[in-house]
């Protein structure tokens, strides 16, 4: 009898342990998103280039090519993917915006697919 009791206790503990290890937490949108503020200097259907400097880019900066922008604003530029955004019609060059995203890729320049944005 005592062997059955000990075996039963061990079996119950093993089941509890395995159930705890198999717990699959679904964070979904509950995961904390990162954000940043910047100025849209280039935009197409799939992505936009943001300058994250505290002051607005000059008028002449909006006429620069993508390569020229990357050279001029080396550490203050982020490429944001727009694939998760339903409507980007109000997102225009020169707009100051705040964007939210889950992960920023540490490429050169950094990039992120934004989940939402707000015009400032």
Swiss-Prot record:
InterPro entries: DUF3221, NA-bd_OB-fold
Domain of life assignment: Bacteria
Cell membrane listed as a keyword: no
Keyword Cytoplasm: no
Secretion signal span: 1-27
Protein name: Uncharacterized protein YobA
Keywords associated with the record: Signal
């Amino acid at each position: 009898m005592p062997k059955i009791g000990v075996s039963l206790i061990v079996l119950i503990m093993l089941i509890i342990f395995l159930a705890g290890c198999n717990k699959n937490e679904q964070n979904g949108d509950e995961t904390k998103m990162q954000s940043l503020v910047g100025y849209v200097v280039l935009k197409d259907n799939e992505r936009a280039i943001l300058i994250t400097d505290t002051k607005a880019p000059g008028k002449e900066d909006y006429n620069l090519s993508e390569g020229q922008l990357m050279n001029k604003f080396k550490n203050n530029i982020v490429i944001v993917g727009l694939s998760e955004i339903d409507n980007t019609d109000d997102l225009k060059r020169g707009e100051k915006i705040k964007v939210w995203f889950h992960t920023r890729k540490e490429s050169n320049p950094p990039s992120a697919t934004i989940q939402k944005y707000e015009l400032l």
